Amino acid sequence: MICPKCTSLSIVKEGTRKRKTGRIQEYSCNSCHKWFVVPVEKEVKGERESIFLEDIEPGDILEYKTDKVFRLYCATDVHHGANEHHYDKFNEFIDEVDSDPNARWILNGDNIELIPPNYKISQRGQSMEPDEQHISFIKRIEHIADKLLFIRGGNHDMIRSVNILGFDVSKVMADILRVPYYRMPGYTRIKVGDVTWYFVSGHGKSGGKNGDLELDKMAAVYSDGDVFFLGHNHQLYAKPLDSLRVLGDKEGVRRRWYIRGGSFLEYADYARYSFFPMVRTGWATIEFAKDKIRAWTN
């Protein structure tokens, strides 16, 4: 096996991902530290492998499998193209993902600002046109797209583009970057060796001050979750929730996590006008191991 990035022969076979179209094998390169994937069973449509062209529909479960500890870097509410987008902070995120050999990451909606013409709010809130936002953002992240687990749309990108044009800009981004696309909230099954964890994620809808209330609703619907992750309200925190369960003839502690993923948007004019609370920019990182899950904010 030769690395397609740098042609090195120093390749390590990593975990696999299960898809509806088959299974893909992941590899990492010891020379350039990049990752690439090879379909275990190739199915070709035209000139592209169908394995990358996948929507995770409501009710479907995406699976990621690995034999070692890995860290999931969660980017939500990036708002690339907004006047107040925090370029330095998101560049820091990109560098972290790029330098971590055990990294995977997600895009969880509101990835670009996307204020279309004649929309209910002024286009003055963005620093470039929507098409330029889409193109420049893809160029900005494409060198770490090999570590991207999935993309989800939010109210800024997916909902606006679908309602106005019947065109899902987030789905197109996922197709270009060849990663699965979540249109709705849902489970991701994560297998670390013989241990299975369930990561529940969605963009979010509520702007309420208490971010736990929406996470409570999510946990009630997705009751098998171990980690519950939402964006949208730009709050940034990760906190454990412990409960008691039955382990044989004794009680044991089950730990789950509530996470609001923050944003990469500084104090915008609309927030200032409405006296929204000021929150720091940043992201959440989740580490999945065989024995436990850890989570923290950056």
Which positions does each model-derived feature cover?
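Short recognition patches in nucleic-acid-associated and regulatory proteins
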Residues: 5-22
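Short Cys/His-rich local motifs and their 1-3 flanking residues in nucleic-acid-associated proteins
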Residues: 5-9, 31-35, 233-235
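Short, non-ligating residues that shape and space the ligands of small metal-coordination modules
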Residues: 12-14, 35-39
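Cysteine-rich micro-motifs
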Residues: 21-35
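Beta-strand-turn-beta hairpins that frame and shape the catalytic cleft
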Residues: 62-73, 187-199, 253-256
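Conserved beta-sheet core of the metallophosphoesterase superfamily
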Residues: 198, 205-296
